[in-house]
């Protein structure tokens, strides 16, 4: 599954650390308005989780983690992101800015197949808590929180 992360703050970086090592998941791209060098620094050194065990560097305007190149963008408008060209299956929306059904739509318009909103969202977006209400999950859903 090809994943893009929109918003590389506390939640985006925490998700990255878990997903990067998970079989079947590939972090393809990150979109964040911060400077690339700063994003790399914050991934390397976390005040809660400590030093990241994988090597992290910046090369050719990409984040390189354990020899894996990750595209990095600094785009305010998600509709302008190249999710279609990158064949993104899921965007993890962790910016905190796109917390409604309608606000997540630009990611889908840009070519992502699904959006997972990490913040509380409006009532149109199904709220799923793993281990509690997994029965709400369906392949037909394009957005969940």
Regions found by a protein language model. Name each.
Residues 1-145:
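N-terminal Rossmann-like NAD(P) cofactor-binding subdomain of oxidoreductases
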């Amino acid at each position: 599954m090809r994943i893009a992360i929109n918003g590389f703050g506390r939640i985006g970086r925490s998700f990255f650390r878990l997903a990067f090592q998970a079989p079947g998941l590939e972090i393809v791209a990150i979109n964040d308005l911060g400077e690339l060098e700063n994003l790399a620094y914050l991934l390397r050194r976390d005040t809660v989780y400590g030093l990241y065990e994988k090597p992290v560097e910046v090369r050719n305007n990409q984040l390189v983690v354990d020899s894996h190149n990750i595209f990095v963008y600094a785009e305010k408008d998600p509709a302008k992101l190249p999710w279609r060209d990158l064949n993104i299956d899921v965007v993890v929306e962790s910016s905190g800015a796109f917390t409604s059904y309608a606000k997540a739509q630009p990611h889908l318009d840009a070519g992502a197949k699904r959006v997972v909103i990490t913040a509380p969202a409006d009532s149109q977006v199904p709220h799923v808590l793993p281990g509690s209400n997994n029965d709400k999950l369906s392949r037909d859903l394009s957005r969940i929180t």
